[in-house]
Amino acid sequence: MSRISKDRYYLNIAREVASRSTCFRARHGAIILRDDQIVSTGYVGAPRKTKDCFERGNCLRDELNIPSGQRYEMCRSIHAEQNAIINAARAGVNLLGGTLYLHSEKKNGETGEYDVIDAYPCFICKKMIVNSGIEKVVLDSKSGESKVYQVSDWVSDWQSNDLLDDVEAYGEKYQVKK
């Protein structure tokens, strides 16, 4: 008899956390572990005690025609990774040496269903992960395979290159005139 891997087990839990998301465009769920125990969870949602997009009945970014991946400050929601880190801080939980698992889905414009996509933290979340002391990030993918990153590799890359050279975060190299 075989069992699913621990990474798949935790990514499945992150998927369930994502189902609490209150974003019309996407659902993301994050869990953070220390010593093989879940210490925090987070999903895409509005700040505590404020109305989310579902309650308001609209997406502010859609109304302003803001493309996906841009102008995050014009979104009512906080990202799943950020919420998981914030929830740990609120509970006084130390994240040093922890592992973050992230599951992501995007709404399909044709079917209205949410399809699993390759998860990857935005650049702001990546910086928060680094500063929180999390050591490892495990990302879900549409293929069902997980991708594992050592946060120390991100730091090393940013030490030898500029932050704008982070092709995985940006999808392309920014062309900055000096």
Descriptions of predicted regions:
Residues 4-5, 12, 40-178:
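Zn2+-dependent cytidine deaminase-like catalytic core
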Residues 27-42:
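Short beta-strand scaffold segments in enzyme catalytic cores
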Residues 2-27:
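Short, basic/aromatic recognition patches
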Residues 16-19, 34-37, 86-90:
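Short glycine/serine- and small hydrophobic-enriched flexible loop segments
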